[in-house]
């Protein structure tokens, strides 16, 4: 992977990202806004899946998910910008790999939800309790996103990356 990181860091795009002093801070702001959307909305939905806020129909909680997806796309774009700008600081950082693991876990968990219990769970109305499988999916999702947040915040402190 270090060969790939060295190649990526030698590209014109990488040099542009680090050459202009406004790019990195702008991406940090956008990344934070995107993360706020993802954690806030996905966290709300996850808590509903876990059995909290039963007055809210599950489908109504899910209606906000397009905003969370927008936030995720903001994070994907800015995260890729960070990676292209300084790939060596990421590939050698345990916190980055832990963050990637949590992202993959969150994605797999969402796929499991959508392909197994999603349709049945969306039909639950106000006052209905969610099945145990939905509670587990919600807990794994919430833990995954909090892991993404935690490990992302640890990036500067683990491995002296920044």
Residue ranges and their predicted role:
Residues 1-162:
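Polytopic transmembrane helical bundles with strong interfacial aromatic enrichment
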């Amino acid at each position: 992977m270090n060969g790939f990181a060295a190649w990526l860091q030698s590209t014109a795009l990488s040099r542009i990202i680090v050459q202009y002093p406004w790019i990195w801070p702008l991406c940090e702001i956008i990344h934070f806004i995107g993360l706020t959307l993802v954690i806030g909305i996905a966290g709300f939905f996850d808590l509903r899946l876990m059995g909290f806020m039963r007055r809210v129909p599950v489908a109504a909680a899910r209606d906000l998910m397009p905003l969370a997806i927008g936030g995720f796309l903001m994070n994907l774009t800015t995260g890729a910008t960070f990676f292209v700008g300084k790939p060596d600081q990421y590939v050698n950082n345990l916190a980055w790999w832990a963050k990637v693991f949590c992202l993959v876990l969150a994605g797999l968990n969402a796929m499991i939800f959508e392909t197994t219990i999603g349709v049945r769970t969306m039909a639950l109305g106000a006052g209905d309790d969610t099945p145990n499988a939905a509670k587990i999916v919600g807990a794994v999702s919430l833990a995954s996103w909090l892991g993404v947040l935690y490990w992302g915040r640890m990036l500067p402190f683990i491995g002296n990356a920044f």
